[in-house]
From Swiss-Prot:
GO terms for biological process: tetrahydrofolate metabolic process. In the presence of tetrahydrofolate, catalyzes the oxidative demethylation of sarcosine to yield glycine, 5,10-methylenetetrahydrofolate and hydrogen peroxide. In the absence of tetrahydrofolate, catalyzes the oxidative demethylation of sarcosine to yield glycine, formaldehyde and hydrogen peroxide. The lineage of its organism: Bacteria, Pseudomonadati, Pseudomonadota, Alphaproteobacteria, Hyphomicrobiales. GO terms for cellular component: cytoplasm. It is an enzyme of class 1 (oxidoreductase). This is Sarcosine oxidase subunit delta. The gene is soxD.
Length: 92
């Protein structure tokens, strides 16, 4: 049985419809120093357990999503629209 991703726009869809683009990190402010930017661009964790990633629904709604999954079991805990999440974080 294929793994299903709970797309907030299309419903449960096979993982093959998505392209994983990497960690869902908070971007440094535009005026951040070069060390912060270096860390953001080049340094990545390789965690075991819960992890958030950007996924693109390339064969569906073509929206960017933030998928929370376990890197050991690959179980998906949550999925939300990346644009909506960015707006909610900006209000904080």
């Amino acid at each position: 049985m294929a793994s299903l991703v709970p797309c907030p726009n299309c419903g449960r869809r096979p993982k093959e419809e998505f392209t994983i683009k990497g960690a869902a990190l908070s971007r440094p402010e535009a005026d951040a120093d070069s060390i912060d930017w270096f860390d953001y661009v080049y340094l990545r964790e390789n965690p075991r357990g819960a992890y958030e990633e950007y996924w693109h629904h390339t064969s569906g709604c073509r929206r960017w999503l933030v998928v929370a999954r376990d890197t050991v079991t690959h179980e998906i805990a949550a999925c939300c629209d990346a644009a909506g999440r960015a707006r909610s974080e900006a209000r904080k």
